[in-house]
Amino acid sequence: MNDAIYKSIKTLPPLDDTVVKIQQICRDENTAIGELVDVIKKDPMLTANILHSANSPLYGFSREITEINQAVNLFGMATIRGFALYGAIKQNFKINLDPYSLNSEQFLDIVSTQNALAFDWCKKLGGEFLNVISPASFLMEVGKIIIAKELIESGKADEFKKAFDEIKSLKELSELEISLVGVD
């Protein structure tokens, strides 16, 4: 692995206490959803983000969701865990995805849409894998933040962006990232 990428990963900011508590609660099979709601209520920004998402057409809930306990019950612990991770990314990362021709708003929209798709897909399959797939859907694009940072710092962003505009497949994207940054 590229040393600069390794250092970037090692220096990522720690998760805040709310996110850590949510992670712990969601890992404990004996935890009641009420405990999760209590932790979320202490974080107004997370509460607002969850309620905003619950009322987004992406999730297709049939009525307006006004209470955080309603949203937590509808989404379930796994998706709430993902929202907490998403909020941590949004708050703690300086997102500059210019090499990928994305701004932070577009990036966060992609992450949110991926989670909505994962949520719907898992629900149709009975929700069995939601505890893994939902948080993963939020995190799978984080590598782009780190790679973009390395491209910018190493002076390869323009070269990457020019080649990126010609990319036609994920395989080609992976090959480009490997060739310029040295990771896959």
For each predicted feature, which ranges?
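Conserved alpha-helical "signature site"
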Residues: 1-184
